[in-house]
Amino acid sequence: TAATYGEPESIPILESDKTEPTNPYGETKLSMEKMMKWTDVAHGVHYVALRYFNACGAHVSGEIGEAHNPETHLIPLILQVPNGQRESISIFGDDYDTKDGTCVRDYIHVTDLAQAHILAVKYLMDGGKSDVFNLGNGVGFTVKEVIETARKVTGHPIPAVISPRRGGDPAKLIASSEKAKSILGWKPEHADLEEIIATAWKWHKNH
């Protein structure tokens, strides 16, 4: 996960950048990476760690989608409003150092992530060494931009309410995925935010 980086020193984020998580989630993921590293050192078990940025979207067929209880991911939470499951969406902080004051994230479609997993397994089966790869589109969108795009996709006004910041939320997380493209041969195909949200909406409105 990109949460292993914490507050980045530069954008886009490289795999070689420092890892200083700012929340328990990122800390546990970084601990897992360290366990894999030491397992390799001790037993020669090679691994690939895939650092997802913001996983999102659903299968284009509309038959496979994302559901958590409780839900914590931004796009599914937004889509709960037009689905009649909540009255509004909360924006946690609008005073960040970004173009509209809300957090910026790099959204990557689940189908592209699935393809990266297949390529990572092939890489290891072909004798690849242990390594870490970022997975993102290299483009950031603010929370307000995501909400506005969801309004366009769904045709619903989706009321938004400004709430206090959440502790440990970095202002910007945008990936450099050039390493995955170069070494794994990964080619993400779903970079358009409107398309990503449309696939998610196709699933959520029927489930």
Residue ranges and their predicted role:
Residues 2, 38, 119-123:
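A generic secondary-structure signal
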Residues 3-54, 61-73:
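Catalytic helix-loop patch of NAD(P)-dependent Rossmann-fold dehydrogenases
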Residues 5, 56, 139-141:
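Feature marks short, surface-exposed loop/turn motifs that line or immediately flank catalytic pockets
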Residues 9, 29, 57, 121, ...:
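Generic alpha-helical secondary structure signal
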Residues 13, 33, 60-61, 125, ...:
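Amphipathic alpha-helical interaction segments
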Residues 57-59, 98:
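Short, acidic Gly/Pro/Ser/Thr-rich loop/turn segments
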Residues 74-207:
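C-terminal substrate-binding subdomain of Rossmann-fold SDR/epimerase-dehydratase oxidoreductases
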